[in-house]
Amino acid sequence: MNISVHEACHSLEAPGALLRRRGGSPDGLVAYVRALLGDQMPADLEAFYREGVEAVGDFRAILPKWNERPEWRREGMLRALLPVQAVPIFSDGAGSLYGLDLSSGAAGPAVYFFDHGDLFERPRWAAGSSLAYLLLLLGRYDHAIAEGCPAGWERSIDPDIESCPRAPPIWRAG
C-alpha cells in the first residue's frame, strides 16, 4: 500500500503528532529549494514543503528560512547532506539528520538516517522507504519505545523499509 505525504500528514493530525508552520505561502520556499537542487526536486519533497510540516512528535523539520528578500534568506542545514546526495528533512534533536535520498532518481525516494558522529559521510540506516512512511514512523516512535516494541516494529507501518538500496533498516545496521 502506498501512501502520499498529504495522507500521512492528515493521519498524524488527529492524534496531535503533527505540528504545522503558521502563515506564508510555500511557493517561494519550493522555488528556492528547486533552484538550489538544480530543478531536480522530488515530488515528495515538494509535497512535504507544501504541507507546512514543522514537527512530528519531537522531531523538528529542517527548512530553509524563506524570505521574499534574497538577502534575508538562510539555507540553514539544507546543504549539509547534498555532498552525499540527500536533503535533510528532520533533526533527531541530538545533531543527526534524516535525509531524503536524491541519488536514486525514484519517484518516491527513501529516507535515511545520517549520524553526526560519521560527519554525515554516508547513511547509517534506512529510516523509511518513502517520506510519507517516515512521517508515520516518526509519529509512532515514542509509543513504540514506551510500549517496548521489538526490533523491526517499523515493518508493520512500512512494509518496504528493508528494500531501501543505500542502507539497511536500523535493526540490521549494527
Q: Model features per residue range: what roles?
A:
Residues E54, W66-R69, A110, A151-R155:
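Short, surface-exposed, charged/polar-biased interaction segments
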Residues D58, I62-W66, G105-A106, G128-S130, ...:
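General N-terminal targeting signals
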Residues D92, D101, D115, D142, ...:
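Acidic side chains
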